[in-house]
Each structure stands twice: as C-alpha cells, then as structure tokens.
Regions:
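Catalytic domains of carbohydrate-active enzymes, especially glycoside hydrolases
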Residues: 13-22, 174-184
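Chitinase-like catalytic core of GlcNAc-active glycosidases
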Residues: 1-133, 137, 141-167, 193-207, ...
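Short, low-complexity, polybasic intrinsically disordered segments
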Residues: 160-181
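A short, acidic, flexible beta-alpha connecting loop/helix-capping segment that sits on the rim
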Residues: 187-192
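Conserved active-site loop/cleft motifs that coordinate metal ions or position small ligands
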Residues: 147-150, 180-186
Length: 223
C-alpha cells in the first residue's frame, strides 16, 4: 500500500470504533523493514493532521522490544522515523521480558530491577531523540510517555521469572515516576498452573505459585 492508502485503512478502523488512542506493535523482522517503517510514519502523520483539522485528539503509542539497556537501535529507528515525519508520540510501551543471560544475569530474582532499569533507559532515550528532533519535553512529560509490560511469571527465555514481589517493585516505581502505562503479558496467563506443566512458558498460566489474577490485583492499584 502507499502511505495514502495505509492512512485510509487506519482511518477506517478509527472511524468504525471511535478510537482516540492507537498502538503500533513493531517487533521481529519488521523492525528492520525501513520502507515499511517510513510508510507507516507518513500514514500516522497524516492521521494526526486529519484529526487536528477535525479538532479531535489522536494519541499514538508504540509497543517495542527492550533490554535493560533500553530500546535497540532498530526500535529507536522506528521512533526517529515518526519524529522526522512530525508524529506526536504519546508513549512507548516496552515489552519488558526475554532479555537473555547477558542482559539479565540474575533472571530468577532481579526481573523487577531489570524492568525498572529498562524504563529508566527508555526515559533517557526519549529525551535524546526528542532533543534531536528539536522537541523539548520535561522529565515529567517523558515519564508520562513510558509504558511497561512485563511478562508474568515464567518468561519465554528460561529461567527468567517475573515474580509477585517483582510486580510490587515495579508498581512502587510506576507510582514514584507517574509513568503513562502499567500493563502485563498477559491477563489470560495470570493464574497458577492447574497441574505440573512440561512447558516452561505457557500461554495459559504463569508457571509459578500464585492466586488467580494475583498480578492483576497488584497492578490494578495503579491508575
């Protein structure tokens, strides 16, 4: 599709559901698809321009993979492309999970700390790329752009485990910084296994001892 065609397709969805917020999840090989990224950025810029003319708000979020050290070069490229096309980015939701041994040397106890480190790294990166684009934002404004989505319990990368204690750490951090979003992957996994599972990471449970919706009960205190 051309940027104009893509914009029209997005606008159709926005109109159908009366959306004021939309999120673009960019991961895997799509992070390296420069033409796709540029086409999307141009389409999103057009959507926001159209919304402004209609005196409507359209909040744009991106969901991107992250390491404790921050977004990857490719992830930053997605945001830099958006800013080049004058997209007003409302926030960046980072998938705080599956870091690997090099980035997460204490995977069974420190996943909360790694999530907090990733958020702090993202904050610094957001400041950097907005300055590059000539856009000044306060620290508070930048924290409001930070979204956190940890993977509950067992992550796909064994033995990474995000615990209930980690969730409480992250909640305290979110409250302190007043971040824009606190979520999880995923609500349908927020339960203990009904029986011992051969799979380390399951789409049906966290793999750890907890009550049903134990993580949700912690995170719902943020709002």
């Amino acid at each position: 599709k051309t940027p104009t065609q893509l914009q029209a397709a997005y606008q159709s969805v926005i109109n159908t559901y009366g959306l004021t917020h939309i999120d673009f999840d960019v991961e895997g090989h799509w992070l390296a698809e420069a033409k796709s990224i540029e086409r999307r950025s141009r389409a999103i810029a057009g959507l926001q321009a159209q919304a402004r003319r209609a005196k409507r708000l359209l909040h744009i979020w991106y969901t991107l993979p992250v390491l404790p050290s921050g977004l990857t070069r490719e992830g930053l490229g997605v945001l830099r492309s958006a800013l080049r096309h004058r997209v007003d980015i409302a926030g960046v939701n980072i998938m705080a999970m599956n870091y690997g041994k090099a980035q997460a040397p204490k995977p069974t106890t420190h996943m909360g700390a790694y999530t907090i480190q990733a958020a702090t790294s993202l904050h610094a990166q957001l400041k950097m790329i907005h300055r590059e684009a000539g856009v000044q934002k306060t620290d508070a404004q930048l924290w409001a752009m930070v979204g956190l989505t940890p993977m509950l319990g067992h992550n796909d990368v064994k033995p990474e485990t995000f615990t209930l204690g980690n969730a409480r750490e992250v909640l305290a951090f979110a409250r302190q910084k007043k971040i824009g979003l606190l979520s999880c992957w995923s609500a349908n996994r927020d339960r203990p296994p009904a029986k011992p599972s051969a799979n380390w990471a399951s789409p049906k449970h966290t793999g750890i001892k907890q009550e049903v919706f134990g993580f949700s009960k912690i995170f719902r205190a943020y709002g």
